Amino acid sequence: MTELHGQDDATALITRLRDATNAHDLEAIVACFAADYRNETPAHPERGFVGREQVRKNWQHILAAIPDLSTEVVRQSRDRDTVWTEWEHRGTRLDGSKHLMRGVVIFGVADGVAAWARFYLEPVVEAAGGVDEFVRKQVGSGRPS
């Protein structure tokens, strides 16, 4: 089967980003993103941003706050220049508390770097109650029909 244009770039980008993050190499992380990179966070629209410099600022803070941060790409799938990735980030914050985030990031890849992403990576909430409690909190306590 012939690889479609962009697939190799997309896969290589995810590998570079994971490796740079695990090495805590800020410059290598930033190099994975286009200068005009666009980050959309559909579940939190106010958190979206544009630009590689915000990527630098975010990762500089993350790496300083979680000195043992490690990342894993749990799964990925790609189609041409788009790659769907499932991530897990874990480590220990400076105050000793555990850091654990899981979720999906969908990347658009151009020229071997991330041009855009739809970001769904969230902190894991342990012991937050079961599904029934969650549904009630989200939609109210009306009676089921």
Please annotate each region the language model reported.
Residues T15-D19, A31-P45:
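Short, solvent-exposed secondary-structure junction/capping segments
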Residues P45-E46, T71:
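Sparse recognition of residues in long alpha-helices and their boundaries
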Residues G6-D9, R18-T21, R47:
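Alpha-helix N-cap/loop-to-helix boundary motif
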Residues T2-H5, D9, E40, R56-S145:
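A beta-strand edge to alpha-helix "cap/lid" segment located at domain peripheries
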Residues E46-K57:
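Short beta-edge strand/loop motif at the mouth of beta-sheet-based domains
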Residues H24-D25:
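Short helix-adjacent coil turns
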